[in-house]
Amino acid sequence: MRKRKPILGLDPNVFFLGLVSFLTDISSELIFTLMPLFLANVLGASTVIIGFISGVADSTASLLNVFSGWFSDRLGKRKYLSFVGYALSSLSKPFMLIAGTWGPIMAIRFADRVGKGIRTAPRDALVADSTAEEVRGRAFGFHRAMDTGGAALGLLAAAVVVYFVQGSVLDLQFDTYRWLIILGLIPALLALFFFIFVQEPQRQLTNATSTGGAAQRPALPGKFKILLALMFLFTLGNSSDAFLILRAQNLGNDVLMIAIMLVMFNLVYALFSTPAGIVSDKLGRRNVIVVGWAIYALVYLGFALSNEPWTIWLLWAFYGLYYGLADGVGRALVSDLVPGEARGTAFGMYNGVVGITLLPASLIAGWLWQSVNPSAPFYFGSALAVLAMLGMVLFIRR
């Protein structure tokens, strides 16, 4: 295969995968970010139902992360599995236009998340396979920045739609949400077009793998298994962001203000993703992740204690900083801890643990909100983040 010229100093695969994620996130943020408000304000769904929809879709679909990552290792092909995932997500979204109860909405959201479950591990492995270790943090940082930049643009577009269709009305209106769905379909289809420029990279396999098949495939390292355990602990307190959105509304912020907050969150996330990756290349992945988790613990404590609408703005900004520091760097850490021929499996397990844990996390959060008070889920999340952070310091030396 002829070597292609770098784009913006990056392997073309990294660039085009970033562009695909950019467009996909514009679409997803337009359609799904304000979905909890549509469920609550228009359909009258309870927080338990909202938590169930968010949790079961993410968790069940995340089982596919493990399978798709393992299968991409066995097949030796990442691109086609990833494309199938993007296609399923994009082609399920038009059905939101005819969904009138929470049941069909859950089914559509499930299909979207199944697509994400199929594509995420092979896509992350594609990024890792296309880059050298010394610049891998930058590559993952760029990908997360593009992903999050798309989310910011999608939310900005959502804020514009909300402003012109319903103004500063506190509750989300049905016609507003319908326009969000229609606009979200355009970038979803563009993403599928740009995916054709992604190529399957050549991977260097160990002798054991190239000659012995699955039985002699290298075992996943102990440090990676510890990382999975820590991610389970952290994610158990990191419920769906739907609860952060509901908390913002609970404190008196209207739909337009919430949309603008989410734009700010994603801009901060995008702004710090690439620098965080570069810093992790120099100072170590673990150190950057620990700082990110510490910020998360403080942010969730702030959501628990906050009584004023304006404080939510500050908390969402720091929540974006946490994501910028921890998300892409966490993926780079996974690729550092495992051999190249097992990366698909490793990313599948990593994303699978995070996604599967979202179901109990969201159900616990919904129950705490409804049975105790709206602050309780955030105290719980903050406490578990501190425990996970201590575990990272003690057990992940690299």
Task: Please describe what each predicted stretch is.
Residues M1-D11, E200-L230:
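Juxtamembrane intracellular "pre-TM" segments in multi-pass secondary transporters
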Residues R4-S62, F224-M261:
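Helix-loop boundary and gating motifs at the non-cytosolic
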Residues L37-V42, L153-D175, P360-A376:
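Transmembrane alpha-helix termini and helix-breaking/packing motifs in multi-pass membrane transporters
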Residues Y80-F95, L185, N287-G302, S382:
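Structural signature of the two symmetry-related core transmembrane helices
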Residues I108-G149, L333:
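Cytoplasmic helix-loop-helix junction between adjacent transmembrane helices
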Residues Y163, L185-N207, A388-I396:
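C-terminal membrane-cytosol helix-exit motif in multi-pass small-molecule transporters
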